[in-house]
Amino acid sequence: MLRKLFSVLTLMAVLIPAIAQPQRGGRPMVSSASPIVNADNTVTFNLDAPHAKSVIISAQFAPKAEMQKREDGIWTITLGPVKPDIYPYCFEVDGIAVQDPQNPDWFPNEGFKNSMVDVRGAEPMDHAVKSVPHGKVDYVNYWSETLGLHGNALVYTPPTYDKNVNEKYPVFYLISGTTDTEEVYFKVGKMNLILDNLIAEGKAKEMIIVLPYGNPAKYTSEVRNTIEFGDLFGKDLLNDLMPYVEANYRTIEDRDYRAIGGFSRGGNQGLSFGLTNLDKFSYLCSYSSFTSMTLPDVYDNAKKTNKQINLFWLGCGTDDFLYGNAKDYAEFLDRKGIRNVQEYTTGMFGHTWMNARYFLSQTFPLLFNKEASEAAMSKTTAVKKPKKSNEPLPAPYVPTSERNNQRLTPELMAALFPPGVVSPKYHADGSATFSVHAPNAQKVELEGQMFEGLKPMEKGERGVWSITIKPDQPDIYPYSFIIDGTKIADPNNVEIFPNEGYKASLADFKAPEPDHQDLQKVPHGKVSYTWYTSKAVGFDRPVCIYTPAGYDPADSKKYPVLYLIHGMTDTYETWFKVGKVNNILDNLIAKGLAEPMIVVMPYANPYPEMILRGQATMYNPMDTQLTTKEFTESVVPFIEENYNVLTDADNRAIAGFSLGGRQTLACGLGNPDMFHYVCAFAPAIFGPEISANFENGTYAPATEINEKMNLVWLSCGTSDFLYQSSLQLEKNFQERGIEHKTMYPGGGHTWMNCRDYITAVAQLLFK
């Protein structure tokens, strides 16, 4: 296996230079890359599926189309040209929906998760990553008494939030649609980038944006079974999330500084909750939605309602299947004399996130700006006298939804949201049942890291295949379904493994007692997503940052920093989403076993964006010079300029897994004046390279390492294909007299081991 990995890495370094110069907006022009956005805005899709009988491309910007199979087993098609925007798509392989395994970008969802293609065009769009000051997006866990468990939400804070520590900000509660998760307005709606750009242009006020999960009943089956539904979302929002936000963020606690809105079901929830809580909200936004026309004490007193609302904004596409309902609702408001703003789009493919992003760009400039919102309300809406409740409508009037049949019906709901499958379903005995709907399949198998080989599944009612598994050891395991030879992630599991390539699902088997990686009832830190300007590559890049419970940018307390690097094909999200480093640190800190620290998780692979921009024609995973330059000259200075951190080497650590371990050794051992803790987890470093790195200056001399390092750590599983390589590295350290610690547990090249590595190392850092 060691020889195999070395061969793979070397082969990539040799072959990838043959990639042609990338086209504008596209990925590298290699035969199987996908998607490729060509110079004329056509898009080429490729899928390696040599055994498939049929492959169809299903993209939001075009009708479904049959792909053509080449002699090498690659299925291909070129569509377009396409109007610049971000579009979801997937492949249908012999009738089974499949993500694009070459595309790192996916659409978070409770159901099937499409891939996304970004057609950028010649000019940056409203949602583009521009070189402007960026806000942060925090992933937070709050205790919900309503639900009896921890809820999830995302919170955007504007660029000046951490600097202007005496400033308070207005808040916009922004809710996504049916089957969407709390991440969608961030990862698909790009709300943070749209607002960053508008703020930089002076077109919008700075504000906090809160993204709740619109379907809290789905958190666990126990919640569905034990809580009386009612307005579960509204109760959680009012009684739990809003108090959490106002206790943990500097908000202006006044109705004139609160807005609520959303897309699709989220628009319905936002309007319904906002209109029945006008003592708390004065800005209401509905994107591709509508709500009840019978809300008490709202519509029949137009004068009072109008006085309470600063902005009532309604937007919908004329080709949206909800256009009829949305138009009916807007006309109802007009008849009732309720002031509102209406905007209708065409050519954005209906009920889509292209519309949702556009609507944000139109409403952000109006929020918390009474002059602008009043101008919009006055210009767009003619205030009409309310009709008496018993006065009939004019004879010619026919509701829009009846005229054009664009309305929500039980039949349409059933077609859009067929009966779901719960998978995985966890049981009290520690097992879980995995299920997938595949009525036409001949053979379905389960593949997972919790067992060897493949497990055959059994077909049951409605064409649902199932199997129940109990692993030997409770843990978090990646898994997939193999349907007639086609591998797919579990379409009913929201938990997915972030990766530049194929993305497996994640199954979390809990032990009877909470483990170090579990979310426990302790003080929680936050994981924030933000952007920094890279001097090494010349454009803005993403980074994840964990700050411990109690961290306050307004406080004078400073913290040590761990720079934590992911492995090959992983992303900057993997240590958070799979490694669970935030939960591990929360629990260790709460028990007094680890020092409170900040953890920085950079994206260690700049090549995809460099190739896209024409700055590179190859990806060289073996090279560590670029990543070392990136970490030392861009990431570390950004953190030390923007966070309350200790800036001496005794308070800096660097660690990484696999390829990230290789990069950690080069950056850490090569810069002993910057890092005094260097920890490599199953590093992708090979025998001949170790001595060469000491001789060519990649690593500092052994005497200097011993003199300056507080900890050099090496760990690897005894079944890991890099185990022998790690033993060679340890032997080299011993021969050079480098003091170090080791950890060699059982297990392979897995994130189960990674979680154990970081748990052990975190207890040794900064002590």
Regions found by a protein language model. Give the residues of each.
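Bacterial Sec-dependent N-terminal signal peptides
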Residues: 1-24
